[in-house]
Amino acid sequence: QECGPASFPIVSLISFLVGLILAFVGALQLSLFGAQMYLADLVGLGMTREMGALMVGIIMAGRTGSSYAAQIGTMNVNNEIDALKTMGFHPMEFIVMPRMMALIIVMPLLCLYADFMGMLGGAAVAIGLFDISTTEYWVRTELAVSFKDILVGVFKASIFGILIAYSGCIRGM
């Protein structure tokens, strides 16, 4: 219930800053070759393929994975898991699966949001420091980023969600 919406502020900040830094460092290198117009391509592809999913994965591992481990560990100490077994409930189905499903659903959504925030950070640098127009930046981004690139990042985020939920729940048990 708290794994998704409560993560938006930190995902927003981190992704915006990653896009900002990616654009700034990339623009400095691209300007050596007179290729600043490819700045939107760099940020768009970098965020959608790799950085968006990676940043969300790191944030959610630290935030949600540790929360899952602590919650389930507390349940274990209080013998709540033994009580579930006694009542005939399988702890994996009752405790682990809902948490895993939550992260499988939330991670791709957070990844898409992180991609957008990173591109927004890149746009801030491109428009503010390197005299690239807003229209030119977003048109170049649209031309560079394909649906396949977005799907690659979303798929990675889903896999990260499974791994984070599984490792957090298993550590708690």
Task: Locate predicted features.
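Membrane-interfacial helix-loop-helix connectors in multipass membrane proteins
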Residues: 21-48, 115-154, 158, 167-173
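Short cytoplasmic-facing helical segments at TM-TM junctions of multi-pass membrane proteins
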Residues: 71-97
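Loop-to-helix entry region at the N-terminal start of transmembrane alpha-helices
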Residues: 2, 6, 10, 33-70, ...
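Short hydrophobic/aromatic-rich motifs at helix boundaries and adjacent loops
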Residues: 15-16, 51-55, 93, 139
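Hydrophobic alpha-helical transmembrane segments that constitute the membrane-spanning cores
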Residues: 14-21, 57, 61, 97-126, ...
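Membrane-embedded alpha-helices of multi-pass transport/permease systems
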Residues: 62-72, 78, 121, 166-170
